[in-house]
Amino acid sequence: MGKIIGIDLGTTNSCVAVLEGGEAQIIANSEGMRTTPSVVAFTKDGERIVGEPAKRQAVTNADKTITSIKTHMGTDYKVNIDGKSYTPQEISAIILQKLKSDAESYLGQTVTEAVITVPAYFTDAQRQATKDAGRIAGLDVKRIINEPTAAALAYGMDKLDQEKKILVFDLGGGTFDVSILEIGDGTFEVLATAGNNRLGGDDFDQIVIDYLAEEFKKAEGVDLRNDKMALQRLKEAAEKAKKELSSTMSSNINLPFITATAEGPKHLNIDLSRAKFEELTRGLVEKTMEPTKTALQDAGLSTGDIDDVLLVGGSTRIPAVQEAVKKFIGKEPHKGINPDECVAAGASIQAGVLAGDVKDLLLLDVTPLSLGIETMGNVMTKIIERNTTIPTKKSQIFSTAADNQTAVDIHVLQGERSMAYDNTTLGRFQLTDIPPAQRGIPQIEVTFDIDANGIVNVSAKDLGTGKEQKITITSNTNLSEAEIEQKIKEAEMNAEADKQKKEKIEAFNQAESTIYQTEKTLNELGDKISSGEKEDIEKAIADLKAVKDNQDATAEELKKATDEVMTKFQKVSQEMYQKAAQEQQAAQGAEQAQDNGPKDDNVVDADFKEVDEDK
């Protein structure tokens, strides 16, 4: 059986590892480096180059050099090179092929299976895209694992007998995740996760790029961002300065011959201090704190409950980031793991678990966002709540909204808002051939099944006929992860507005149901109810219909009008019930009187006398 490798497919850098002798070994690439830049380039001759060689030639070949493709996974984004379009999956597959090749060179055998990591906040579409990229690269992706969870595995592999609660703070090149885990007795259980998939080292670089470009524009009147070659040089200089400022107090950015004007060549020479860098990027550092607070709240923990803090991703080397985490949690972050390599190491440990090489280790991850379907009134009805342990399977019974409805549309949603249109559509499908019946009679069981990779399967089954329709969610969300993180924030900010909307929808649905049931029962009762009582109820129904048809009516007004109908109808029902009970008692009394009749002495005596005479 071949080895299963562990891959950290990163935004800026990627890494591959394998489990040997019970320990994760990072595999060096063909250039001798332990991490590989996630860069793909196409030369003038059509040759495809990956990693460090691709990064080195980016200045002179900016148009055909692709970076940070991970940020486009799960979208319809295309890269056009020499008239050919490439999807993010294809570009990612090129990087994976490089990592696969390096692993094969190290192991001396063909590699066909892998565990690949993704940000914890990746959507279903992005996870599916990652699996597709692996397949294009010739890899059977045995498991998709969340990056913070993989880091926790690397950290806790030698601490299986210890009980700890850890916070993983993962700030990479393009994404940010924070996860809270509890480890003990060989179990790694994710308690909560939060994040922002549009926040990472690239954003820090961009701020430095803009600062340098603006400073140069002030001095020379030229915007370097309009020159692709100059912009690429700025990008490289900004990244280098950012890294230098993690260990020094100042960095000199010196780019001779950065551009030229009619006056001659122009040079860029700017000193950037750590203090200035921290001032420029303070907003980005602060952005990492909100998801951290959310994760702690969702886990039901306080900062004092955290035993260890793991810093993962190259961007956590920034001193201001480390200081912010230390200040918020109140303890020094753990420095015992390599932030660039621990995710791949953890992936290789999970690969070892799947291969049977690692015993007594159980990983319990969670789904980052709630899943549900659209129900009557555009309401998002959640079936699986966010931070539910996966794999999981949950079902809920629904019914039809109209009489003789023979089909139902299942609109699958992901998000935290109350209204369907405020959430992300994952897919749609239809369950047909439902036997005609009154509304509310058919029983439609909707089941959500999330596998260990976080991939969603949804089915709808008519319990009456056994007919079933299934869908594996593979749809493209066309949505940035910043928008997904925004959904949770919006849900908190708009909680009251959402609550009012939902209450009105529920009141509207209750009103419709009350009207339907009351009118139906009145028709069935016919002349059993007096005309005066019937008119009284019909007037209350008419009043309720008027309120229901008023767009400006509040939930309270709908409830009040609904209660009026129910009160009047219940009063009549009670009177009818009492009348029926009295009639029943009277009938029983008459029957009892008849039963007592044969016990009359004369009758009994006569019967006995006849018998005696015969004898």
Swiss-Prot record:
Q: Region labeled Disordered — which residues? A: 573-615
List the InterPro entries hit by this protein, alphabetically.
ATPase_NBD, Chaperone_DnaK, Heat_shock_70_CS, HSP70_C_sf, HSP70_peptide-bd_sf, Hsp_70_fam
Coiled-coil region: none
Q: Name one Pfam family in it.
A: HSP70
Briefly state the protein's biological role. Answer: Acts as a chaperone.
The Swiss-Prot or TrEMBL record describes its family as follows: Belongs to the heat shock protein 70 family.
Q: What is this protein called?
A: Chaperone protein DnaK
List the source organism.
Clostridioides difficile (strain 630) (Peptoclostridium difficile)
Q: What is the lineage of its organism?
A: Bacteria, Bacillati, Bacillota, Clostridia, Peptostreptococcales
